[in-house]
Amino acid sequence: MKPTTVIGAGFGGLALAIRLQAAGIPVLLLEQRDKPGGRAYVYEDQGFTFDAGPTVITDPSAIEELFALAGKQLKEYVELLPVTPFYRLCWESGKVFNYDNDQTRLEAQIQQFNPRDVEGYRQFLDYSRAVFKEGYLKLGTVPFLSFRDMLRAAPQLAKLQAWRSVYSKVASYIEDEHLRQAFSFHSLLVGGNPFATSSIYTLIHALEREWGVWFPRGGTGALVQGMIKLFQDLGGEVVLNARVSHMETTGNKIEAVHLEDGRRFLTQAVASNADVVHTYRDLLSQHPAAVKQSNKLQTKRMSNSLFVLYFGLNHHHDQLAHHTVCFGPRYRELIDEIFNHDGLAEDFSLYLHAPCVTDSSLAPEGCGSYYVLAPVPHLGTANLDWTVEGPKLRDRIFAYLEQHYMPGLRSQLVTHRMFTPFDFRDQLNAYHGSAFSVEPVLTQSAWFRPHNRDKTITNLYLVGAGTHPGAGIPGVIGSAKATAGLMLEDLI
């Protein structure tokens, strides 16, 4: 039997490969880089380990399900450690909000910001849980292949006011601006503007309250390695440094996948975990339907990009939380500039990752591994020269962190590297250097998103951030479940 080919060993591609292999379908997993993981790549330098991308595990059950399919337990392959608080949220005014899973502690903190918002938060949590039940548990792994699928979901989505933005819905319950930011920033974790993204994405709050926030011992890369080992234990084949040049088609069927080094792999089906525009524009450029789909996709709104700094210090800043969100002086205005303006803002808001707070093995003794990211416009919004802007932004961020959060940072610096929108474009083939693929606005969600199964090329499937349900680890693992269901129907 010719194997099924999965292009890309990100979380979505890995999860799909495991599901297919566990069901008895031989899978060939092709990864263009020298390590699996996709955006969850790992850098190692002078004893420091840096997770390149996702660092927040919020639905362990979705990962555990993959291992259960093989009759295994997640804990046999990787240990998940609880993270408390989930996030520490900080403002330049000096205000701090430790967001965790203890209702009493949360309400006590909310009381200090605005007593009236305690009841408002309870109502918001009820709403978030209702959206979580409908949008995540019911619809998160259901492929939307026809408009009828969308119509069936429409009444409940209307009841939940899905046309409202995340921020608008939060603001309908909560008065204090700090708290509005605290409960609306989550959509930025999946590339969504809180002022434009559907309020359905408030479900992320309920998701975290339901299952907590976790971190793999050894870093997110250890989870990737655990999933690779599971896939190989099932008999799956992984090929690294396998850069796909194109897919060979006969009529509306893919016959083979070609690599840039000349290798050719016959296949019975292809699931692409690569960027969706790259898949249609570059890998299927000879197929008329793919060209049409590529042109259509290039008119869609893409999510923002990111500027990321990985740095190792000869000092462990134990005053930090594992996850810190550093809000700058502006919120709405800054986000508007990131998503809609041709230029780079003078100010920024940051996410600071300090994993040694939870797992000290990620740095030499007494040292600390860190990364900090700033949301920035993608290259289609602001076509900046990041060889110029990158070093300037790096210096501004290091100075800011040293002043506000990490005294002595620059004198403690052992190693650092940058990852810019150019790198998202060049290393990950991300269209416009987008960090999260298609922007998750309502008119680009569910049926309006690129479908998990192509409607013309009969054995082409999509998995990952660019298809339903969207970005984030729970999203792409959910997409793998949706796509696997379709493939098993078609291939068995």
Curated annotation (Swiss-Prot):
Residues engaged in binding FAD: 5-38
Pathway per the UniProt entry: Carotenoid biosynthesis; lycopene biosynthesis
**What's in the keyword line of the UniProt record?**
Carotenoid biosynthesis, Cell membrane, FAD, Flavoprotein, Membrane, Oxidoreductase
Q: What class of enzyme is it?
A: oxidoreductase
Q: Which Gene3D superfamilies match?
A: FAD/NAD(P)-binding domain
Family as reported in the entry's similarity comment: Belongs to the carotenoid/retinoid oxidoreductase family.
Name recorded for this polypeptide: Phytoene desaturase (lycopene-forming)
Taxonomic source organism: Pantoea ananas (Erwinia uredovora)
